[in-house]
Amino acid sequence: FRMELVAASPDIGQPMNLAFDERGRLWVTSTLEYPYPAPLGQRGRDTIKLLEDTNGDGAYDKLTTFADGLNIPTGIYPYRDGEVAWSIPNIWFLRDTDGDGRADKREKLYGPLGFERDTHGMQSSFTRGLDGWLHLTHGFNNTTTVNAADGSSITMNSGNTYRVQLDGSSV
């Protein structure tokens, strides 16, 4: 195998997570906040960057800031016209409705969720399961109750995996 650098500072600073979509684009979370979150109610300084190969040569030649103002985005999953992403204290669906590569709509799917005790123990590893649900990890040392639109809920404390519907309807 061969290892190649595809993105680095200053374009991508302190990457936390990455994911590929069906078009081969690379989505990368970048943080300045970690490990100290921005205070609630204040805009975070973290981003999700979108890297694209626009000329088909196998190298990323376009970098777009898909979403900014985020707060330690440790989990992402490309979905439809955007990303399902964790940004303290919620799981969001960030959408690009006009096709310019930038999120212009933000819909809260789940939250607020716990993060106060330790930013190492938040929502991450967003993976679509064979069952069609989004599977996530919930790290250690935080207590989190996830409530869904249908009234279902779970409470977790330290080290869990769980699943949610991508539309916020069920957990």
Regions found by a protein language model. Give the residues of each.
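Beta-propeller domains with acidic blade repeats across secreted/periplasmic ectodomains
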Residues: F1-V171
